[in-house]
């Protein structure tokens, strides 16, 4: 983990497990955390990727979703509180 950024690997999780893990990270993210990088995978993670992007795009703590060059990762950029 680098300062301001948290990584969360949800490979092999189902939607419910991933949601529980992501929600826990969002709850515990302190003021110094501005980004959560969610590693969902690409080949077998497409359904999970789409679910995460659709579910968290309107989350109150998420300012925006960024898609990187690596299609197996989705970044949640957090709002300042």
Regions found by a protein language model. Give the residues of each.
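Long, charged, low-complexity intrinsically disordered regions
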Residues: 1-81
């Amino acid at each position: 983990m680098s300062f301001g950024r948290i990584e969360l690997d949800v490979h092999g999780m189902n939607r419910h497990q991933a949601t529980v893990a992501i929600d826990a990270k969002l709850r515990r993210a302190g003021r110094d955390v501005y980004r959560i990088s969610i590693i969902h995978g690409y080949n077998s993670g497409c359904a999970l990727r789409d679910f995460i992007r659709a579910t968290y795009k309107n989350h109150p703590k998420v300012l925006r979703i960024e898609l990187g060059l690596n299609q197996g990762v989705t970044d949640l950029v957090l709002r300042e509180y």
